[in-house]
A protein has these predicted regions:
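N-terminal signal-anchor transmembrane alpha helix of single-pass membrane proteins
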Residues: 10-32
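Structural motif
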Residues: 2-5, 16
């Protein structure tokens, strides 16, 4: 026969196991909700910029310049306000995405999957200009979050290009 202490012990173990299972389930649900929130936040921002960035891309992509002075002559805020606005809007977008990735609000792989190529293309095209812009205007680091984002996405890009 099973004594009363054994029955009570089994009851306590079952209750404790139930609580533990409930806590684990809750933690897993919270992680899933966090991923969903990240995706939702990213898509809200992406959708806000989608039309503008898509239109701007058609004008910014063919921009050609040799150094800071040449850029300012062709696309500067005084000579070509529309070109300047479009070029700068890309920086605002990549700075925003980089900030969210750095703060852990959005996973870098999510940004990469949706527009990693755009970030790579823009930063490689724009970095020399923005570095010189910072030098000439006394700003030590003009686009820290864009550069951070670029550095986070490049290993993913390289892995994809090498078939990894």
């Amino acid at each position: 026969m099973v004594d009363q202490i054994t029955v009570q012990t089994i009851g306590v173990l079952v209750a404790a196991s139930s609580v533990l299972i409930g806590v684990v389930y809750y933690i897993l649900q919270m992680k899933e909700q966090n991923k969903n929130r990240q995706a939702q936040l990213f898509m809200q921002i992406y959708n806000h910029y989608l039309d503008r960035i898509s239109d701007d891309e058609m004008d910014v992509f063919p921009m050609k310049y040799n150094g800071y002075d040449d850029f300012m002559e062709k696309y500067g805020w005084d000579t070509n306000p529309d070109g300047w606005r479009k070029f700068s809007r890309f920086l605002s977008y990549t700075e925003g995405m980089g900030t969210l990735v750095k703060r852990g609000l959005i996973d870098a792989s999510l940004v990469y999957d949706i527009n990693g190529g755009l970030v790579k293309w823009y930063w490689e095209k724009a970095k020399p200009f923005w570095v010189e812009f910072g030098v000439r205007h006394g700003v030590t680091h003009v686009a820290p979050f864009t550069e951070y984002l670029y550095e986070r996405l490049m290993p993913m890009y390289e892995a994809e290009m090498s078939g990894g």
